[in-house]
Amino acid sequence: MVAQKSRLLARAFPYLDIFSVFALTPPPQSFGHTPHRRLRWYLMTGYVFYATAILATVFIVSYFNIIAIDEEVLEYNVSDFTRVMGNIQKSLYSIMAIANHLNMLINYRRLGGIYKDIADLEMDMDEASQCFGGQRQRFSFRFRMALCVGVWMILMVGSMPRLTMTAMGPFVSTLLKILTEFVMIMQQLKSLEYCVFVLIIYELVLRLRRTLSQLQEEFQDCEQQDMLQALCVALKRNQLLLGRIWRLEGDVGSYFTPTMLLLFLYNGLTILHMVNWAYINKFLYDSCCQYERFLVCSTLLVNLLLPCLLSQRCINAYNCFPRILHKIRCTSADPNFAMLTRGLREYSLQMEHLKLRFTCGGLFDINLKYFGGLLVTIFGYIIILIQFKVQAIAANRYKKVVN
């Protein structure tokens, strides 16, 4: 198994096991070589049937929620716009589940390659850092994983049912509400699965940056030709490892593109849908779920903020490399050493061309700048939606006065 080769994956696999229970990702134990091939085949066959059952459950939940939306629209006699928005939002349950299952099926080998690349990168980094005393502070990755992923997972799973159960209305049965909660939590956990891989990349970047800083300290005091050549070889190795991290980020981005794209779309549309119903219930009917709806919208936004924040931190750590290279150039004991000058030039050119972006299929970048733009867009649509509702209510009242 790849977890036996990588400490990072060994600490991330418990979270990935949880995601596999929700049929978001294949079981991590299914990757790698094992002598029990027949047992592995049986387990994977069972998991395929389990994932199919989850998909069928999502279809059922989506269908009956659409029926409930139609009944609620007829009961309250609201506009067809509310019906269309609600049906699209509920249909995204099925669309997101189909996209995720197809992504698992089509990109199964790619995900296995990502695990292998992470394990190989960690092993090569440990080997490259041995002459500098090895890597330090290994416990920090486990702490960051628990703080960023584990704590938010507990808060979200614990709070979502309390906030959304009542707001589903009387047209949804208790059993259907429970299944709907399961589907909603399942879809939101996709963001945390993405965060796990971002944290792994972030840890690899931090380790490589630490090694480069140690190289910079060695260059300050080194004047012997043989030692300078050895340090230049280590610098070149650091450059190649950073290029492999850049390629790893590209593979991770390609794997998560369809599901993260739909998650951003779903959360944005859900916020608009909940604001729409909050407005309807506030001004037309008596509602008891105003604060719950606000907290749900905040939860959906935080669940989008988390991957953007972690990606931005990783980008910032990656962008520190040119500054360290500049320090090496300025503080080296022999800055005119030809091999060092050539190595620094090649490294700097690589940093100019290989930018860490965490792009979502080239449509947008997952970072704080995009999240700010997303907030502006959502608030803009909310303002348009409220203006549309105010005009509709004013027109109806005018007709009543005239009649």
UniProtKB/Swiss-Prot annotation:
Gene Ontology CC annotation, any one: neuronal cell body
Residues on Cytoplasmic side: 1-11, 70-83, 166-191, 281-365
Transmembrane segments: 12-32, 49-69, 84-104, 145-165, 192-212, 260-280, 366-386
Pfam family, one: 7tm_7
Example of a GO biological process term: sensory perception of taste
Bilayer topology annotation: Multi-pass membrane protein
GO molecular function annotations of the record: ligand-gated monoatomic ion channel activity
Localization (cell): Cell membrane
Alphabetically ordered keywords of this record: Cell membrane, Membrane, Receptor, Transducer, Transmembrane, Transmembrane helix
Top-level taxon of origin: Eukaryota
Keyword Iron: no
Extracellular topological intervals: 33-48, 105-144, 213-259, 387-403
UniProt keyword annotation of Nucleotide-binding present: no
Record's function text: Probable gustatory receptor which mediates acceptance or avoidance behavior, depending on its substrates.
Family of this protein: Belongs to the insect chemoreceptor superfamily. Gustatory receptor (GR) family. Gr2a subfamily.
Protein name: Putative gustatory receptor 98b
Organism, scientific name: Drosophila melanogaster
The organism's taxonomic lineage, starting at the top: Eukaryota, Metazoa, Ecdysozoa, Arthropoda, Hexapoda
Name of the gene this protein is made from: Gr98b
